[in-house]
Amino acid sequence: MTPKEFIKQYKPFALETERKTGISHLFILAQAALETGWAKSVPGNMFFGIKAGKYTPPEKKQLLTTTEILSSPNLKHLFPLVISVKMLSSGKYKYEVKDWFRKYDTPEGSFTHHAHLFFQNKVYTKALEVRSDPYKFAEEVAKAGYATAPDYASSLKKIIKKIEENNS
């Protein structure tokens, strides 16, 4: 799917979420694009890489392969299955693992749950103060630990810019 096609298909969900929450639709679209590779991989309508919790019902979760960047090689207990662990030049560790993620009946369900996540978790309080600015929100969400990728904020900001350029 091209960026223009992605925007056309998923912008209505992002705009509706922005209307309800004040979170910039540009940020929402950028995060969905980043997490899915512009909808190349959307297992279980999961657009935002949201992990399943301990209390997530079995029918609402799926076991998927993912990459995590962590500070210790001794965190294998965090995952149902560890495929590999490699030390990076930064001193951090790249884990290739299987982990539980949420799944949704519809794309809209994924977009709605994603927005609620920010309001339900105190770590995003500072981010919510700047939720109308997609660039600042991306910075704060990354600082709060949404993802383990060290370049998460800069990746989001590049995609926000690409969406702005293709959003005509």
Give the ranges of each region predicted by the language model.
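Catalytic cores of secreted/periplasmic lytic hydrolases that degrade extracellular macromolecules
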Residues: 1-168
